[in-house]
């Protein structure tokens, strides 16, 4: 899972393309 690129339910990380 690419949590660093896309956050599933965790808004702690900022995704590049949302």
UniProtKB/Swiss-Prot annotation:
PTM-bearing positions, type Sulfotyrosine: 6
Record's keyword terms, sorted: Blood coagulation, Coiled coil, Disulfide bond, Hemostasis, Pyrrolidone carboxylic acid, Secreted, Sulfation
Keyword check for Nucleotidyltransferase: no
One of the record's GO cellular component terms: extracellular region
Subcellular location, principal: secreted
Keyword Coiled coil recorded: yes
Source organism, top-level taxon: Eukaryota
Modification type Pyrrolidone carboxylic acid: residues: 1
Post-translational note: Conversion of fibrinogen to fibrin is triggered by thrombin, which cleaves fibrinopeptides A and B from alpha and beta chains, and thus exposes the N-terminal polymerization sites responsible for the formation of the soft clot.
Function according to Swiss-Prot or TrEMBL: Cleaved by the protease thrombin to yield monomers which, together with fibrinogen alpha (FGA) and fibrinogen gamma (FGG), polymerize to form an insoluble fibrin matrix. Fibrin has a major function in hemostasis as one of the primary components of blood clots.
Oligomer and partners: Heterohexamer; disulfide linked. Contains 2 sets of 3 non-identical chains (alpha, beta and gamma). The 2 heterotrimers are in head to head conformation with the N-termini in a small central domain.
Protein name, as recorded: Fibrinogen beta chain
Organism: Anas platyrhynchos
Taxonomic placement: Eukaryota, Metazoa, Chordata, Craniata, Vertebrata
Gene assigned in the entry: FGB
